[in-house]
Amino acid sequence: MNADRTLSDEQYDWIVAYERHITPHAVLSVRTPAYGRMPPLQIPTFTGPTPTYFVYDGNVEEVSGQLIKDPSDDTLPHHYAATWTCSLFTSRPPSDPAWPRDSVMQYDSNWSPYHRVPMRYFPSFMTLDSDLLGPNDGFWPLLHRCAGFRLRSPWRFPLDVLAAGIGTTVSTIRSLEKAGALNTVEGLLRALGWKYHHLSGLRPQHVEYCMSVWSLSFTRADLDVIDPASWFDGLLRSPIYPDEAPIGLNCEQITTHPFVLLNWIRVQLMDDGC
């Protein structure tokens, strides 16, 4: 194919660059725009008081103020943000005896609920207007509290700790299971006092996996022999429809979703006959 030189420069560049049987001459013919030297990045100069790290401790406490980014971040080091509001972090001074000097959790850490929180406009299991979710709708506090389980794999936590993370108890879940109140998505949400927006961040296939008979057929004995991570691995391998938008959550965030943790507790209780 010989490119027509009567074409515009943009058309000619496109043809040469994307020609199927490209030749060395054609490669040399690809025009690249000139670029100038990258200007040096200016590190912000901070002259105010010493910033305080915000440490996640599981308490829902709204605080606001300056936040320092992790110095190991690949963006500008020590960049101060003056308008951050962290609803699940407690501000502690370095003099506090509980100051975790070697394990400060940054807001952009994977363990932080603010690291890739679910987008507010993706579709959930049922059609809903996620933009109408307010800060006190009950979902965000659960999601933020469960973010603390990313420090370790969720199956390593005792069931009572996981249940407390989703705002209930093991005995309550056992009673609801015996009554058959958790056999459907609608019944499960109703029994826990949740709404459909409590499924935000999950795809329908994730919800179907958690509610499937196959998923709940695992027993503690099975998981002890195979691997406690098998159930979560199956969840992450759920076939997501390719025509849907990206999930917006990574693996750790999916496996610590409140709805997922609730069904994991159900799996563990199956061996007890509830």
From Swiss-Prot:
This is Non-structural protein 4. The gene is S7. It comes from Aquareovirus C (isolate Golden shiner/USA/GSRV/1977). Belongs to the aquareoviridae NS4 protein family.
